[in-house]
């Protein structure tokens, strides 16, 4: 049976300098999100890189999320170049757009208004927290953005080093409570392999995972060379080993509604059974994100008919997205479809218990209103 173990996602930078083989090796090593830095490269080169990532991901039958990182500037935070880059990124159907030098929620709104004007309001905005003003205005920024990227090395200038770990912990905790995905950039030396990483490197990565980050990102990587493949392998190994030894905190629901109540119930069920996995049906990704916010010990299989949601969910902690080629309407069809998908991918065995979370009826539901404990048919050999 194929194992589904790692829950923390890995982000790495891919550039036009990256070869096809290196991109393939990086995806195989465990890269979930490819960050494309728009400070470098022509549009033709960047388009080719994006096409290569998509092609290889398709061949490997694995989702890879595309994160466009704008060059950004301090004044204004969204420059004329950034506007052109956003338009190009939208033409390439990027999944997330990261904006730097954010000082207030207004900076996020400027980008969101641009996306609205371009008919791309569903494209997620990542707020890079790297300025003291952003830290001071953190809550209002979180109310506007769709995800957060933090890099202690960036906002560490002028701040006492002993405060940085607690600041990172506070930001991650607030994001977890609000249900906002958070990426933690970690410094990894260019010569890093798992055997030669320093204790400080490993400790920083482990702490970010224990704090509850959704993803860890290889910082200061302008190109994906062989060393980035080794860096991804290191992050995957540290994440897998850390997750096996800790119990994540369950975050209290940010809202009091049916969907939030069901997501809270997941943890109680998981601790008693536990199930093999949680299967969620989602058209927007909302249900899967709520389930992930509870930090269950078992993987979340997010089934969606929407290719954009399929890719974007690959950033979310603990979520394994699956793209559906057909939609179902009845409860019986839904259950049968879950079994078929999980069996085909060798994620379950006969007799395994799973949790199904969805909105019934599937095509007309106004939200998640259904949770079922289901036993996979058949007998164990």
Predicted regions and their residues:
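Non-catalytic helical/linker scaffolds that mediate oligomerization, partner binding
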Residues: 1-381
